[in-house]
């Protein structure tokens, strides 16, 4: 009976079973024949059964949903599961006492990055996650190298996240792979060490 505020970080609350529906729009009416289940699922597959369970749970529950992005709010609002439900967007807060401009040379020294290059940054928990758009970054870097071959020695790409080494052979500039970083102070150093942060996420 008590009101519940549910903060969404992906689409799972508003779909049958998937965290990101991608091209599938079944969740807007009713999940079934899930394209992410082996052989495309079936009429009453796991996505259908879970969707119906969520529908039953949500129907009489005083749940208010909060999303961290406008995009996620838009996806949630068209879900049949959320009919009549409150969905609002509250962006994640940023600690401006921590995330603020600092000395670039000192930051590069802490991250063991070169002082004599322009550096582009790309980061993700898992670099090979297609939603993060690494393929677009690779394509953009190739175009940049074609148009400005003179930048090949003066430009570098810093990549942090799991499997970051995989981009070393695919980007025509020197790549500085870093592991996935949880420590916020280390993340602040990386942001301050680079000249440009790229977000090619889909």
What are these language model-derived features?
Residues 2-38, 64-66:
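Active-site proximal beta-strand in glycosyltransferases
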Residues 15-19, 41-89, 94-106:
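A short, active-site helix/loop in glycosyltransferases that binds the activated sugar's phosphate group
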Residues 63-64, 86, 113-121, 155-156, ...:
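Charged active-site motifs of nucleotide-sugar-dependent glycosyltransferases
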Residues 68, 90-93, 122-126, 160, ...:
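Short hydrophobic "strand-cap" motifs at the C-terminus of beta-strands
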Residues 101-119, 150:
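Nucleotide-sugar donor-binding and catalytic loop/hinge architecture
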Residues 113-132, 138-142:
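Conserved donor-binding/catalytic core segment of Leloir-type glycosyltransferases
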Residues 148-196:
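Nucleotide-activated donor-binding/catalytic signature segment of Leloir-type glycosyltransferases, i.e.
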Residues 202:
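Aromatic "clamp/platform" in nucleotide-sugar-dependent glycosyltransferases that forms part
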């Amino acid at each position: 009976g008590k009101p519940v505020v549910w903060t969404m970080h992906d689409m799972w609350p508003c779909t049958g079973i998937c965290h990101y529906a991608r091209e599938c729009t079944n969740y807007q009416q009713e999940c079934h024949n899930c394209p992410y289940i082996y052989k495309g699922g079936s009429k009453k597959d796991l996505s259908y059964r879970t969707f119906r369970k969520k529908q039953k749970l949500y129907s009489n529950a005083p749940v208010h949903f909060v999303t961290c992005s406008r995009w996620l709010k838009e996806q949630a609002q068209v879900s049949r599961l959320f009919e009549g439900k409150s969905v609002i967007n509250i962006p994640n807060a940023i600690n401006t006492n921590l995330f603020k401009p600092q000395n670039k040379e000192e930051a590069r020294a802490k991250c063991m990055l070169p002082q004599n290059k322009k550096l582009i940054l790309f980061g993700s928990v898992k670099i090979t996650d297609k939603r993060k758009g690494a393929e677009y970054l690779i394509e953009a870097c190739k175009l940049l190298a074609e148009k400005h071959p003179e930048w090949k020695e003066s430009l570098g790409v810093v990549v942090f996240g799991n499997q970051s080494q995989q981009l070393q052979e695919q980007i025509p500039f020197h790549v500085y792979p870093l592991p996935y970083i949880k420590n916020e102070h280390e993340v602040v150093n990386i942001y301050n060490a680079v000249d440009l942060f790229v977000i090619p996420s889909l």
